[in-house]
């Protein structure tokens, strides 16, 4: 019975507590809660009695809410708030009037288009027993000077950004101060005045904002190009060297002016003394041909016509003048060659027997000549120039793809041959003609240097091998890629035929050149290599052949040069070989 009585008492107390709480909730006036920063929440844990309340649907925590009112600045015009209005705010009533824009926020900076272009709007007046003092747009709004609306906590603006860049509303790029980087890029720079407003102590700080070097360092200014680094100064122009120091005993035309030409030169028709040729006045000449210097330079192919006065223009050799229309006409060349013919004194045609035998063609393969072409008397080989020329025949590698190695003894043999040839009347007359045409100077050394350069300068015919020269090609022979080339001298042909290495196959054409020589066009094979067409002088001296080829190469390179020997007209064909800035003799032979 005691237990039942206690249970009944406990049940009654529980029901009484439950009804009391329900009645309290029904009578409570609900209002909009304040912001979190204006609400202070105190939580109290329930006692053991709260467990029974929770069991019957009641919460066991008691929440006490107190509003922290911001400090209110009173003014003489402020209206005194009644205790009733301060303790219990009236219920929130939403007006049915149309909503009005509140305008920009009070802390909107001047860089924002919303804060700079229009005046702030006044918010609608709520029914309240208090009246706040309006703030002027020119002064920063301070929420602590306005009383809060009923049921709302006071407005607290956002804290300013920690750096000096304006991040509000994207007000567009601001003009950057001088030296802070490129204009129109990056974030806009805020003004140098920053205002910090807090809810409790109000502090206004004004000062220069330090430049943030860590975030956006200023770009360096453009560097002007340095003349020393980018555009090095050019060296001072060198003064042209003066005239070379004259060498005793060897006067040179480069050191003395040439005689003034008086009239065009025509080669004399009467032979002069072989020891002392009669000098001819220096003729006038044009610039249709580039003369070949004697020291290391070269000439290009001449393109004037094969007739009389060609019309091309090229550079004239330094130190010479040009006043005519042609360096040399065809008639002048023929007159010169006739003069050379009269000076030919070492012809060996009388000591040679020519056995032409049967005719052939270049396309034939049959042997139309079972016997040798030439039968040479030993007296024909006793001429001083022929003796020195024969010493050069064994100095060459005939394969053009094998490098030539000139020994000192071979170089001496070349010089001895040149000295012997340059001393002959034929070669001296040819050099005198070239001197009159401005191709060479009066200095005899330049004549020799010209002949040596044209005929004995080594060059390459392919694969980078220095294995050819003009003399080797014309007066001996060469083999290029299995083809025989050259072989245009009768002395070497006679030696090879005597040794059984030259097999004569027949002739195609022949022509006598007066009584001092012959020209034959033949077909032959040499050590198993066939040459279908080959033209060669027979019986002429080395100096005459060398003089004809040199003059024609200087005046009519890369085409047929008109020649007349003993009133027999034919042509001389020369080909130039360009190598390392020089025009050298690639080939030369008579053409009938």
Curated annotation (Swiss-Prot):
One of its GO terms (cellular component) is extracellular region. The keyword Disulfide bond does not apply. PROSITE patterns: ENDOU. It comes from the Eukaryota. Disruption phenotype: Viable without any behavioral or developmental defects but adults have reduced lifespan. From 3 weeks of age onwards male and female adults have reduced triacylglycerol levels and lipid droplets are reduced in size. Adult flies show faster consumption of lipid stores upon starvation. RNAi-mediated knockdown in fat body tissue results in adults with smaller lipid droplets in fat body cells. Endoribonuclease that cleaves single-stranded RNAs; unlike its paralog EndoU it does not appear to preferentially cleave at uridylates and releases linear products instead of products that have 2'-3'-cyclic phosphate termini. Preferentially cleaves single stranded RNA at sites with AU, UC and poly-U sites cleaved less efficiently. Targets mRNAs encoding proteins involved in lipid metabolism, particularly those involved in lipolysis, to regulate their expression. This is Endoribonuclease Arlr.
